[in-house]
Amino acid sequence: MLSDMSLIATLSFFTLLPFLVAAGTCYIKFSIVFVMVRNALGLQQVPSNMTLNGIALIMALFVMKPIIEAGYENYLNGPQKFDTISDIVRFSDSGLMEYKQYLKKHTDLELARFFQRSEEENADLKSAENNDYSLFSLLPAYALSEIKDAFKIGFYLYLPFVVVDLVISSILLALGMMMMSPITISVPIKLVLFVALDGWGILSKALIEQYINIPA
């Protein structure tokens, strides 16, 4: 039988799980990049949001699989007790070490230091100075870092499509076809180029390789 604290911890975990997946994994970057690519192509609802989010979730699970397995093994090798709040905090610091290393690796450390200092308020800053960040300071810093990186990637992906739009607009203007919408011509051209270059495959591989070293 689970103790009251263990039951509360279990229910809290499953309640917060969707938010942890959305903000505490690489899903946040994948979903933003995919939506920005769709917008850059000039498409509104194709692929649908559900499709893009599903692909982003599957890719995120693929990347996070070793970390999830390591956390589960630490839990099994315990034994772990969740009778008090301190037990839960202790497990988050020791049992989730692989996850903390993942967060730290892909986090802007300046943001992590800011949240660590804010968490400690005006107390001793020794842990932040020794690069020993708590899980609760790494999570917001990681989420903001992933959003920033996703916007950077989206900017570079937008550039070639903007060039195509400008070229099509200039050609239509030179031909005197000012009444025709450039989108009518540019969207099919961008689609052909994107499919011919295997855009989805290249983009997906590049995103995954930011987290996993895959031999050629």
UniProtKB/Swiss-Prot annotation:
- Write out the transmembrane intervals: 8-28, 52-72, 153-173, 183-203
In the record, biological process GO terms are: protein secretion
Keyword Cell membrane appears in the UniProt entry: yes
Database matches in InterPro entries: T3SS_IM_P (IPR005838), T3SS_YscR-like (IPR005773)
Q: Which top-rank group of organisms is this from?
A: Bacteria
Cellular location(s)? Cell membrane
Regarding the membrane, this protein is recorded as: Multi-pass membrane protein
Q: Which Pfam families match?
A: FliP
Q: Which UniProt keywords apply?
A: Cell membrane, Membrane, Plasmid, Transmembrane, Transmembrane helix, Virulence
Q: One Gene Ontology cellular component annotation?
A: plasma membrane
Family statement drawn from the similarity comment of this UniProt entry: Belongs to the FliP/MopC/SpaP family.
Which NCBIfam families is this protein grouped with? PRK12796.1, PRK12797.1, yscR
Its biological purpose is as follows: Required for surface presentation of invasion plasmid antigens. Could play a role in preserving the translocation competence of the ipa antigens. Required for invasion and for secretion of the three Ipa proteins.
What's this protein's name?
A: Surface presentation of antigens protein SpaP
Which organism was this protein described from?
Shigella flexneri
